[in-house]
Amino acid sequence: GPTAYCAQLDGSKAFAKDFMIKHHIPTAKYQTFSDAEQAIAYVKAEGAPIVIKADGLAAGKGVIVAMSEQEAIDAINDMLSGNKFGDAGSRVVIEQFLQGEEASFICMIDGNNILPMATSQDHKRIGEGDTGLNTGGMGAYSPAPVVTQQVHDKVIARVIQPVVDAMNANGTP
């Protein structure tokens, strides 16, 4: 398994985002907050749609794609003030909304070699037609049709390989 340092890439969205910025790995614009008032001010400045994420692991339910400012404010208050996700929600990452389809790209890495597994796309939303809140997972299909060979190669070159290189440079493969 991963080292404790590397496990933070999955266990803390704030850590992962900071890691990506530090190592010039493409990611959406973001800010991290533990204060609800500051987070709400940021949402008001950025506008909606916007994505609110509990920093820690929240059983697949810690991400709210807020289509309105009020929905974003409610999510911030639930996470930071309402303690909805316990310690996982003691910080939030507020991220730029990116239009498009999401796919999962999982690799096995031994510190140097990359073995890509089959890609997949989740059925995350509770309602028909990809509507409603995210769930912990309603199912998935694989391989993900949006991951063409060109997309696959681009993800390896611009995301996966730079992560491996950065972990090795940090002495934490």
Residue ranges of model-derived segments:
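A short, GP-enriched loop/loop-strand-helix hinge that lies immediately N-terminal to
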Residues: 1-11, 25-32
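Internal nucleotide-binding/catalytic subdomain
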Residues: 66-173
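Conserved anion/nucleotide-ligand pocket segment
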Residues: 47-69
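Short acidic-hydrophobic, aromatic-tinged amphipathic segments that line or gate anion-handling sites
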Residues: 31-35, 66
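Catalytic-core regions of core metabolic enzymes
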Residues: 4-6, 16, 38-39, 71, ...
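Short, charged, surface-exposed secondary-structure boundary motifs
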Residues: 8-14, 127-129
